[in-house]
Amino acid sequence: FPYTTLFRSEGIKQHAAHEAVTHHDVKAVEYYIDDQLDKAPAELTNINDALKTLVHFACTSEDINNLSIARCVKNAMENVWTPAFKEIIDHLAEKADQYRDKSLLSLTHGQPATPTTLGKELAVYVYRLGRQLKRIENQEYLGKINGATGTFGAHLAACPDVDWIAVSREFVTNRMGLTWNPLTTQIESHDWQAELYGTVAHANRIMHNLCVDVWMYISRGVFAQVPVKGATGSSTMPHKVNPIRFENAEANFEISCSLLDTLAATLVESRWQRDLTDSTTQRNIGSALGYSLLALTNLMGGLTSIHPNDAVIERELDENWEVLGEPIQTAMRACELKGLPGMDKPYEKVKELMRGHEISQDDVERFIDGLAFDAETAARLKALTPATYTGVAAKLVDFDR
Protein backbone atom coordinates (compact mmCIF):
# COMPACT_ATOMS: atom_id res chain seq x y z
CA PHE A 1 0.00 0.00 0.00
CA PRO A 2 1.43 3.45 -0.85
CA TYR A 3 1.65 5.66 2.21
CA THR A 4 -0.56 8.30 0.57
CA THR A 5 -3.26 5.67 0.05
CA LEU A 6 -3.15 4.47 3.64
CA PHE A 7 -2.93 7.70 5.54
CA ARG A 8 -5.60 10.02 4.29
CA SER A 9 -8.28 11.66 6.42
CA GLU A 10 -9.91 8.33 7.27
CA GLY A 11 -6.55 6.90 8.25
CA ILE A 12 -5.86 9.88 10.49
CA LYS A 13 -9.17 9.24 12.26
CA GLN A 14 -8.32 5.57 12.76
CA HIS A 15 -4.89 6.43 14.14
CA ALA A 16 -6.41 9.03 16.46
CA ALA A 17 -8.87 6.44 17.75
CA HIS A 18 -6.02 4.09 18.63
CA GLU A 19 -4.03 6.87 20.30
CA ALA A 20 -7.05 7.85 22.39
CA VAL A 21 -6.81 4.39 23.94
CA THR A 22 -3.04 3.86 24.02
CA HIS A 23 -1.98 7.42 24.91
CA HIS A 24 1.14 6.47 22.95
CA ASP A 25 1.77 7.77 19.45
CA VAL A 26 4.02 5.02 18.11
CA LYS A 27 1.95 2.19 19.59
CA ALA A 28 -1.08 3.72 17.92
CA VAL A 29 0.81 3.68 14.60
CA GLU A 30 1.68 0.02 15.17
CA TYR A 31 -1.99 -0.86 15.68
CA TYR A 32 -2.95 1.21 12.67
CA ILE A 33 -0.46 -0.71 10.49
CA ASP A 34 -1.92 -3.96 11.85
CA ASP A 35 -5.35 -2.77 10.74
CA GLN A 36 -4.06 -2.08 7.25
CA LEU A 37 -2.38 -5.48 7.00
CA ASP A 38 -5.75 -7.04 7.74
CA LYS A 39 -7.00 -5.29 4.61
CA ALA A 40 -4.03 -6.36 2.46
CA PRO A 41 -4.61 -7.75 -1.04
CA ALA A 42 -5.51 -11.42 -1.34
CA GLU A 43 -2.03 -12.43 -2.54
CA LEU A 44 -0.60 -11.42 0.82
CA THR A 45 -3.14 -13.37 2.89
CA ASN A 46 -0.78 -16.23 3.66
CA ILE A 47 1.79 -13.98 5.30
CA ASN A 48 -0.40 -11.37 6.97
CA ASP A 49 0.00 -12.91 10.42
CA ALA A 50 3.76 -13.06 10.03
CA LEU A 51 3.91 -9.48 8.90
CA LYS A 52 1.82 -8.33 11.84
CA THR A 53 4.18 -10.16 14.20
CA LEU A 54 7.14 -8.32 12.72
CA VAL A 55 5.61 -4.85 13.06
CA HIS A 56 7.71 -3.05 15.69
CA PHE A 57 9.81 -6.18 16.25
CA ALA A 58 12.39 -5.62 19.04
CA CYS A 59 11.97 -1.87 18.62
CA THR A 60 11.44 0.89 21.11
CA SER A 61 9.45 3.93 20.02
CA GLU A 62 12.58 6.03 19.76
CA ASP A 63 13.98 3.59 17.19
CA ILE A 64 11.15 4.74 14.94
CA ASN A 65 10.98 8.39 15.91
CA ASN A 66 14.68 9.26 15.77
CA LEU A 67 14.98 7.90 12.24
CA SER A 68 11.79 9.61 11.08
CA ILE A 69 12.80 12.96 12.54
CA ALA A 70 16.34 12.78 11.18
CA ARG A 71 15.07 11.98 7.68
CA CYS A 72 12.44 14.73 7.84
CA VAL A 73 14.94 17.34 9.02
CA LYS A 74 17.56 16.21 6.50
CA ASN A 75 15.04 16.44 3.67
CA ALA A 76 13.79 19.84 4.86
CA MET A 77 17.29 21.26 5.13
CA GLU A 78 18.67 19.86 1.88
CA ASN A 79 15.64 20.40 -0.34
CA VAL A 80 13.88 23.45 1.12
CA TRP A 81 15.78 25.59 3.63
CA THR A 82 19.31 25.42 2.21
CA PRO A 83 18.30 26.26 -1.40
CA ALA A 84 16.50 29.37 -0.09
CA PHE A 85 19.57 30.25 2.00
CA LYS A 86 21.87 29.82 -1.00
CA GLU A 87 19.63 32.09 -3.04
CA ILE A 88 20.23 34.88 -0.52
CA ILE A 89 24.00 34.34 -0.60
CA ASP A 90 24.11 34.18 -4.40
CA HIS A 91 22.12 37.40 -4.71
CA LEU A 92 24.37 39.20 -2.23
CA ALA A 93 27.48 37.93 -4.03
CA GLU A 94 26.15 39.17 -7.36
CA LYS A 95 25.43 42.62 -5.93
CA ALA A 96 28.76 42.72 -4.10
CA ASP A 97 30.54 42.24 -7.41
CA GLN A 98 28.27 44.74 -9.18
CA TYR A 99 28.85 47.44 -6.57
CA ARG A 100 32.46 46.67 -5.65
CA ASP A 101 33.57 50.14 -6.86
CA LYS A 102 30.60 52.13 -5.57
CA SER A 103 32.04 54.30 -2.79
CA LEU A 104 30.06 54.59 0.43
CA LEU A 105 30.49 56.71 3.54
CA SER A 106 31.06 54.44 6.52
CA LEU A 107 29.48 55.17 9.88
CA THR A 108 31.08 53.85 13.04
CA HIS A 109 29.11 54.59 16.19
CA GLY A 110 26.71 56.34 13.83
CA GLN A 111 29.33 58.95 12.92
CA PRO A 112 31.18 59.52 9.59
CA ALA A 113 34.20 57.25 9.24
CA THR A 114 36.67 55.96 6.66
CA PRO A 115 34.79 55.34 3.39
CA THR A 116 34.26 51.85 2.05
CA THR A 117 32.40 50.49 -0.97
CA LEU A 118 28.88 49.14 -1.05
CA GLY A 119 30.13 45.97 -2.70
CA LYS A 120 32.67 45.32 0.04
CA GLU A 121 30.02 45.75 2.75
CA LEU A 122 27.76 43.23 1.01
CA ALA A 123 30.74 40.90 0.57
CA VAL A 124 31.19 40.89 4.34
CA TYR A 125 27.78 39.24 4.62
CA VAL A 126 28.53 36.82 1.79
CA TYR A 127 31.64 35.67 3.65
CA ARG A 128 29.88 35.39 7.01
CA LEU A 129 26.92 33.48 5.62
CA GLY A 130 29.16 31.29 3.46
CA ARG A 131 30.95 29.98 6.55
CA GLN A 132 27.62 28.91 8.06
CA LEU A 133 26.57 27.35 4.75
CA LYS A 134 29.67 25.14 4.78
CA ARG A 135 28.81 23.92 8.27
CA ILE A 136 25.23 23.17 7.24
CA GLU A 137 26.32 21.33 4.09
CA ASN A 138 28.75 19.21 6.14
CA GLN A 139 26.19 18.49 8.85
CA GLU A 140 25.78 14.87 9.91
CA TYR A 141 22.29 13.50 10.52
CA LEU A 142 22.56 10.63 12.99
CA GLY A 143 20.22 7.72 13.58
CA LYS A 144 20.04 4.57 15.66
CA ILE A 145 18.00 1.37 15.92
CA ASN A 146 19.22 -0.65 18.91
CA GLY A 147 16.34 -1.26 21.30
CA ALA A 148 15.02 -0.04 24.60
CA THR A 149 18.33 1.02 26.15
CA GLY A 150 20.68 0.79 23.20
CA THR A 151 21.98 -2.74 23.98
CA PHE A 152 20.16 -4.93 21.41
CA GLY A 153 18.94 -6.98 24.39
CA ALA A 154 15.57 -7.98 22.94
CA HIS A 155 17.12 -8.64 19.54
CA LEU A 156 19.60 -11.15 20.96
CA ALA A 157 16.98 -12.77 23.17
CA ALA A 158 14.86 -13.52 20.11
CA CYS A 159 17.53 -14.21 17.48
CA PRO A 160 20.95 -14.71 19.08
CA ASP A 161 22.69 -15.80 15.87
CA VAL A 162 22.05 -12.54 14.00
CA ASP A 163 24.78 -9.88 13.87
CA TRP A 164 22.46 -7.13 15.04
CA ILE A 165 25.18 -4.49 15.12
CA ALA A 166 25.83 -5.06 11.41
CA VAL A 167 22.11 -5.12 10.65
CA SER A 168 21.61 -1.86 12.53
CA ARG A 169 24.54 -0.18 10.82
CA GLU A 170 23.41 -1.26 7.36
CA PHE A 171 19.81 -0.22 7.94
CA VAL A 172 20.61 3.24 9.31
CA THR A 173 23.35 3.97 6.79
CA ASN A 174 22.09 2.44 3.56
CA ARG A 175 18.32 2.23 3.99
CA MET A 176 17.79 5.44 5.94
CA GLY A 177 20.66 7.45 4.43
CA LEU A 178 21.85 8.63 7.85
CA THR A 179 25.04 8.44 9.90
CA TRP A 180 24.89 5.44 12.23
CA ASN A 181 25.16 6.20 15.94
CA PRO A 182 26.51 3.06 17.68
CA LEU A 183 26.34 4.35 21.25
CA THR A 184 23.06 5.62 22.68
CA THR A 185 20.70 5.23 25.58
CA GLN A 186 17.06 4.63 24.63
CA ILE A 187 17.20 7.83 22.62
CA GLU A 188 19.54 9.02 19.92
CA SER A 189 21.46 11.69 21.79
CA HIS A 190 20.34 14.60 19.56
CA ASP A 191 23.77 16.22 19.54
CA TRP A 192 23.60 16.56 15.77
CA GLN A 193 20.32 18.42 16.17
CA ALA A 194 21.85 20.84 18.67
CA GLU A 195 24.73 21.43 16.26
CA LEU A 196 22.43 22.04 13.31
CA TYR A 197 19.97 24.28 15.12
CA GLY A 198 22.84 26.28 16.58
CA THR A 199 24.23 26.84 13.10
CA VAL A 200 20.85 27.77 11.63
CA ALA A 201 20.28 30.19 14.52
CA HIS A 202 23.72 31.70 13.89
CA ALA A 203 22.86 32.15 10.21
CA ASN A 204 19.52 33.66 11.24
CA ARG A 205 21.27 36.22 13.42
CA ILE A 206 23.70 37.21 10.68
CA MET A 207 20.76 37.75 8.33
CA HIS A 208 18.92 39.65 11.06
CA ASN A 209 21.96 41.94 11.21
CA LEU A 210 21.73 42.31 7.42
CA CYS A 211 18.04 43.24 7.69
CA VAL A 212 18.80 45.92 10.26
CA ASP A 213 21.70 47.31 8.22
CA VAL A 214 19.66 47.49 5.02
CA TRP A 215 16.72 49.00 6.92
CA MET A 216 19.02 51.76 8.18
CA TYR A 217 20.55 52.27 4.73
CA ILE A 218 17.00 52.75 3.41
CA SER A 219 16.22 55.19 6.23
CA ARG A 220 19.42 57.06 5.41
CA GLY A 221 18.56 57.16 1.71
CA VAL A 222 21.51 55.04 0.58
CA PHE A 223 19.10 52.44 -0.76
CA ALA A 224 15.91 53.38 -2.58
CA GLN A 225 12.90 51.07 -2.63
CA VAL A 226 10.98 50.17 -5.74
CA PRO A 227 7.30 50.96 -5.06
CA VAL A 228 4.92 48.07 -5.68
CA LYS A 229 2.02 49.19 -7.85
CA GLY A 230 -1.19 49.17 -5.84
CA ALA A 231 0.55 48.61 -2.50
CA THR A 232 -0.17 50.81 0.53
CA GLY A 233 2.50 51.89 2.99
CA SER A 234 0.23 53.65 5.46
CA SER A 235 -3.51 53.82 6.01
CA THR A 236 -3.27 57.60 6.46
CA MET A 237 -0.01 58.75 4.81
CA PRO A 238 -0.25 58.09 1.07
CA HIS A 239 3.43 58.80 0.38
CA LYS A 240 4.81 55.98 2.53
CA VAL A 241 6.89 53.13 1.07
CA ASN A 242 7.83 51.12 4.13
CA PRO A 243 10.63 48.51 4.34
CA ILE A 244 8.14 45.93 5.58
CA ARG A 245 9.87 42.90 4.06
CA PHE A 246 12.98 43.55 6.13
CA GLU A 247 10.91 44.21 9.25
CA ASN A 248 8.94 40.99 8.73
CA ALA A 249 12.17 39.08 8.19
CA GLU A 250 13.62 40.48 11.42
CA ALA A 251 10.62 39.35 13.44
CA ASN A 252 10.55 35.87 11.94
CA PHE A 253 14.29 35.40 12.42
CA GLU A 254 13.85 36.33 16.08
CA ILE A 255 11.01 33.84 16.60
CA SER A 256 12.98 31.14 14.79
CA CYS A 257 16.06 31.78 16.92
CA SER A 258 14.10 31.58 20.16
CA LEU A 259 12.74 28.16 19.16
CA LEU A 260 16.07 26.92 17.81
CA ASP A 261 17.88 28.01 20.97
CA THR A 262 15.35 26.11 23.09
CA LEU A 263 15.71 23.02 20.91
CA ALA A 264 19.51 23.12 21.05
CA ALA A 265 19.56 23.58 24.82
CA THR A 266 16.86 21.05 25.70
CA LEU A 267 17.63 18.19 23.33
CA VAL A 268 21.16 17.53 24.61
CA GLU A 269 19.85 16.50 28.03
CA SER A 270 17.91 13.38 29.02
CA ARG A 271 17.39 11.79 32.45
CA TRP A 272 19.41 8.57 32.70
CA GLN A 273 18.36 6.30 29.84
CA ARG A 274 15.51 8.62 28.73
CA ASP A 275 12.70 10.97 29.61
CA LEU A 276 9.99 12.45 27.41
CA THR A 277 11.02 16.11 27.28
CA ASP A 278 12.74 15.61 23.93
CA SER A 279 9.56 14.26 22.36
CA THR A 280 7.54 17.35 23.23
CA THR A 281 10.39 19.67 22.27
CA GLN A 282 10.90 18.10 18.84
CA ARG A 283 7.30 18.83 17.88
CA ASN A 284 8.50 22.42 17.38
CA ILE A 285 11.25 21.67 14.84
CA GLY A 286 8.97 22.41 11.92
CA SER A 287 7.93 25.73 13.41
CA ALA A 288 11.53 26.75 14.12
CA LEU A 289 12.68 26.05 10.58
CA GLY A 290 9.43 27.35 9.12
CA TYR A 291 9.80 30.78 10.72
CA SER A 292 13.35 30.93 9.38
CA LEU A 293 12.17 29.97 5.89
CA LEU A 294 9.49 32.66 6.03
CA ALA A 295 12.17 35.17 7.02
CA LEU A 296 14.37 34.06 4.10
CA THR A 297 11.47 34.61 1.72
CA ASN A 298 10.81 38.09 3.12
CA LEU A 299 14.50 38.99 3.04
CA MET A 300 14.87 37.90 -0.58
CA GLY A 301 11.80 39.91 -1.52
CA GLY A 302 13.28 42.95 0.17
CA LEU A 303 16.73 42.60 -1.40
CA THR A 304 15.29 42.37 -4.90
CA SER A 305 13.23 45.54 -4.41
CA ILE A 306 16.04 47.98 -3.56
CA HIS A 307 18.80 49.74 -5.48
CA PRO A 308 21.54 52.24 -4.57
CA ASN A 309 20.54 55.90 -4.52
CA ASP A 310 23.57 57.44 -6.20
CA ALA A 311 22.60 61.04 -5.47
CA VAL A 312 22.42 60.45 -1.72
CA ILE A 313 25.60 58.37 -1.67
CA GLU A 314 27.57 61.04 -3.52
CA ARG A 315 26.17 63.86 -1.38
CA GLU A 316 27.11 62.09 1.85
CA LEU A 317 30.68 61.63 0.67
CA ASP A 318 31.02 65.21 -0.54
CA GLU A 319 29.72 66.57 2.76
CA ASN A 320 32.27 64.72 4.90
CA TRP A 321 35.77 65.74 3.91
CA GLU A 322 36.83 65.34 7.53
CA VAL A 323 37.19 61.60 6.92
CA LEU A 324 40.47 62.44 5.17
CA GLY A 325 41.95 63.33 8.54
CA GLU A 326 42.97 59.69 8.95
CA PRO A 327 45.22 59.40 5.87
CA ILE A 328 46.71 62.86 6.49
CA GLN A 329 47.73 62.18 10.09
CA THR A 330 49.03 58.72 9.15
CA ALA A 331 51.14 60.22 6.34
CA MET A 332 52.45 62.81 8.82
CA ARG A 333 53.60 60.00 11.11
CA ALA A 334 55.50 58.39 8.23
CA CYS A 335 57.10 61.73 7.34
CA GLU A 336 58.08 62.33 10.95
CA LEU A 337 59.98 59.05 10.87
CA LYS A 338 61.82 60.38 7.80
CA GLY A 339 62.87 63.45 9.79
CA LEU A 340 60.71 66.03 7.99
CA PRO A 341 60.10 69.13 10.14
CA GLY A 342 56.71 70.12 11.59
CA MET A 343 55.31 66.59 11.61
CA ASP A 344 55.22 66.16 15.39
CA LYS A 345 51.89 65.47 17.12
CA PRO A 346 50.15 64.65 13.84
CA TYR A 347 47.00 63.25 15.40
CA GLU A 348 46.51 66.27 17.62
CA LYS A 349 47.07 68.77 14.79
CA VAL A 350 44.54 67.09 12.50
CA LYS A 351 42.11 66.71 15.38
CA GLU A 352 42.31 70.44 16.12
CA LEU A 353 41.50 71.25 12.50
CA MET A 354 38.73 68.77 11.85
CA ARG A 355 36.97 67.59 14.98
CA GLY A 356 33.61 69.30 15.39
CA HIS A 357 34.04 71.49 12.31
CA GLU A 358 32.56 71.45 8.83
CA ILE A 359 35.49 70.75 6.53
CA SER A 360 35.67 71.44 2.81
CA GLN A 361 38.07 70.32 0.12
CA ASP A 362 39.75 73.73 0.29
CA ASP A 363 40.33 73.33 4.04
CA VAL A 364 41.99 69.96 3.47
CA GLU A 365 44.23 71.26 0.68
CA ARG A 366 45.28 74.33 2.69
CA PHE A 367 46.21 72.13 5.64
CA ILE A 368 48.32 69.88 3.41
CA ASP A 369 50.01 72.89 1.80
CA GLY A 370 50.87 74.24 5.24
CA LEU A 371 52.96 71.19 6.11
CA ALA A 372 56.44 70.23 4.91
CA PHE A 373 55.36 67.15 2.99
CA ASP A 374 57.60 66.02 0.17
CA ALA A 375 56.07 66.74 -3.23
CA GLU A 376 55.05 63.13 -3.91
CA THR A 377 53.24 62.70 -0.59
CA ALA A 378 51.52 66.08 -0.87
CA ALA A 379 50.29 65.27 -4.36
CA ARG A 380 49.05 61.85 -3.26
CA LEU A 381 47.11 63.30 -0.32
CA LYS A 382 45.64 66.18 -2.34
CA ALA A 383 44.43 63.69 -4.95
CA LEU A 384 42.34 61.90 -2.33
CA THR A 385 38.63 62.59 -2.00
CA PRO A 386 36.10 60.91 0.27
CA ALA A 387 34.93 58.95 -2.79
CA THR A 388 38.41 57.67 -3.68
CA TYR A 389 39.64 56.99 -0.14
CA THR A 390 38.45 53.38 -0.08
CA GLY A 391 41.73 51.51 0.17
CA VAL A 392 41.51 48.07 -1.45
CA ALA A 393 37.81 47.65 -0.67
CA ALA A 394 36.98 46.74 -4.28
CA LYS A 395 39.68 44.05 -4.38
CA LEU A 396 38.54 42.52 -1.10
CA VAL A 397 35.24 41.52 -2.72
CA ASP A 398 37.19 38.73 -4.45
CA PHE A 399 37.57 37.01 -1.07
CA ASP A 400 33.87 36.77 -0.29
CA ARG A 401 33.74 33.05 -1.11
Model-derived features: where do they sit?
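A helix-coil-helix interface module used to build multimeric assemblies
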Residues: 1-155, 159, 163-173, 233-234, ...
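Glycine-rich cofactor/substrate-binding loops
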Residues: 18-23, 221-223, 234-401
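A structural signal for well-ordered alpha-helices, especially hydrophobic packing surfaces
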Residues: 30, 37, 41, 81, ...
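Hydrophobic stripe of amphipathic alpha-helices that form coiled-coil interfaces
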Residues: 40, 95, 99-102, 136-139, ...
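A structural signal for small-residue-enriched, beta-sheet-centric alpha/beta enzyme cores
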Residues: 61, 156-160, 175, 180-187, ...
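Amphipathic alpha-helical coiled-coil segments and their boundaries
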Residues: 74, 81, 122, 189, ...
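Short, well-ordered beta-strand elements within core beta-sheets of diverse protein domains
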Residues: 76, 120, 194-202, 328-338
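Acidic, glycine-rich loop-and-beta core segments that form the ion-binding/anion-interacting portion
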Residues: 161-253, 257
